[in-house]
């Protein structure tokens, strides 16, 4: 009560002295409190950890960043009993010195990030995000999914993401005008990729029986075979269709021992080509007694205009099949077309170059990745291969570059600032680098 009276007395004295009433101190105190809270909110929204500034995702801009990184659950905790939403998830934008911005984005499995002329495209289980020089937009998904497969830039400027689980693939497309469309493809899976405006998957009827009737009908119509093989392999289109089942574009008998799990194809017109491994149980490997069967590199080629498939052996310089040893593989590669060659590096770090016209192939190099750092993430340009790796002991992150031919790995930058987000916390498990993308046109490693 006395405080209230004192405030009234002070206000009355001010009125007498200046000829007009002053604002009570109580109002001034509230105004000061508002200012303090505003400053605190701003400080909270921009938290500094070394060379990284933590912001809300809506505050992110591409600024001078050259590398976009997706952090989330991965190899380090593959055997742990955690659900995907028990993990943190982050998007990081780094400049050429390893400094930049980081924002919390809910974790997804196999989170992918794409960077093209529209900006940095990434997502959570419920939203997709596009970060540009001007800021970040969010686009709500019609179907919530926790497992991403790959992101693609379409010729008309739209951005698409394939995600899904055991129920099948869903393609979510963010159009240039901001519209979002979604297409469900029940009980689909397997390799995915892009050819022009089409997002495609390669399925087999043994694993994905829901599509069997349509696939067998397509095979019968094209082959006239009244007794089709027991199992068929087909190329289906995942986007831009209205039916309950994806359209069947090509179909052929399944080949035992033909394996390739990919997220991209070489595309030329209506023809897609995918490096694959063909294992022959009857043929002995030339790599010693530890090998149970011969594994050779082949090109799996599908002509979508005729619906036919062909298998092209990849030959070495001596004209022999290019054989792989027990530790080499081609799955989940990152690839680029350089002249007539398709150059790619697998998720295990094996790099190859294959001439798509002649089938001539070369093994370029293999990366000996320490178990504590496995797997590394890769990106490719016409000049060479980039890898972003987190050291197992202290989670120090290094961006390195190696030319396709005639060179060794060279470090571009090393940063300790990501360790804060990658290390195990009190309530959260260890995180990994799920993927990364380079700013279009930036090739700092080659300079």
Q: What label would you give each PLM region?
A:
Residues 3-6, 14, 39, 46, ...:
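Compositionally biased regions
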Residues 47-57, 62-65:
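Short domain-boundary/entry signatures in modular proteins, especially
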Residues 53-59, 105-118, 144-156, 185-202, ...:
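Repeated scaffold domains used in trafficking and secretory/extracellular systems
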Residues 59-84, 112-130, 150-165, 169-172, ...:
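Short beta-strand elements that form the blades of beta-propeller/WD-repeat-like
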């Amino acid at each position: 009560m006395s405080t209230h009276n004192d405030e009234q007395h002070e206000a009355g004295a001010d009125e007498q002295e200046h000829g007009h009433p002053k604002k009570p101190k109580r109002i001034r105190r509230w105004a000061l409190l508002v200012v303090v809270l505003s400053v605190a909110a701003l400080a909270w929204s921009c938290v500094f950890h070394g060379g990284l500034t933590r912001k809300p995702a809506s505050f992110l801009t591409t600024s001078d960043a050259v590398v976009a990184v997706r952090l989330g659950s991965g190899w380090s905790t593959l055997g742990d009993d955690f659900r995907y939403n028990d993990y943190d998830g982050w998007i990081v934008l780094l400049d050429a010195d390893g400094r930049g911005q980081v924002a919390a984005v809910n974790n997804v499995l196999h989170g992918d990030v794409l960077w093209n002329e529209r900006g940095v495209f990434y997502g959570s289980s419920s939203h997709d995000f596009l970060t540009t020089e001007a800021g970040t937009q969010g686009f709500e998904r019609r179907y919530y999914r926790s497992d991403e497969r790959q992101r693609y830039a379409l010729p008309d400027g739209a951005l698409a993401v394939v995600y899904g689980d055991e129920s099948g693939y869903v393609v979510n497309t963010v159009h240039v005008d901001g519209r979002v469309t979604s297409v469900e493809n029940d009980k689909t899976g397997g390799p995915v990729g892009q050819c022009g405006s089409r997002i495609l998957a390669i399925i087999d009827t043994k694993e994905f029986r829901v599509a069997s009737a349509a696939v067998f009908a397509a095979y019968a119509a094209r082959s006239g075979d009244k007794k089709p093989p027991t199992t068929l392999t087909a190329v289906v289109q995942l986007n831009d269709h209205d039916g309950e089942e994806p359209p069947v574009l090509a179909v052929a008998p399944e080949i035992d021992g033909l394996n390739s799990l990919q997220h991209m194809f070489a595309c030329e017109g209506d023809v897609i080509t995918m490096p694959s491994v063909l294992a022959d149980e009857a043929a002995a490997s030339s790599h010693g007694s530890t090998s149970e069967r011969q594994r050779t590199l082949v090109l799996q080629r599908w002509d979508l205009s005729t619906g036919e498939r062909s298998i092209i052996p990849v030959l070495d310089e001596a004209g022999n099949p290019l054989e792989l040893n027990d530790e080499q593989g081609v799955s989940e590669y990152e690839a680029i077309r350089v002249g007539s060659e398709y150059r790619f590096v697998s998720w295990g770090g094996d790099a190859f170059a294959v001439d798509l016209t002649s089938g001539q192939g070369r093994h370029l190099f293999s990366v000996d990745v320490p178990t504590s750092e496995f797997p590394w993430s890769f990106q490719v340009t016409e000049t060479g291969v980039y890898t972003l790796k987190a050291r197992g002991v202290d989670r120090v992150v290094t961006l390195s570059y190696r030319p396709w031919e005639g060179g060794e790995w060279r470090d571009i930058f090393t940063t300790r600032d990501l360790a804060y987000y990658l290390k195990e916390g009190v309530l959260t498990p260890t995180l990994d680098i799920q993927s990364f993308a380079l700013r279009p046109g930036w090739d700092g490693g080659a300079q």
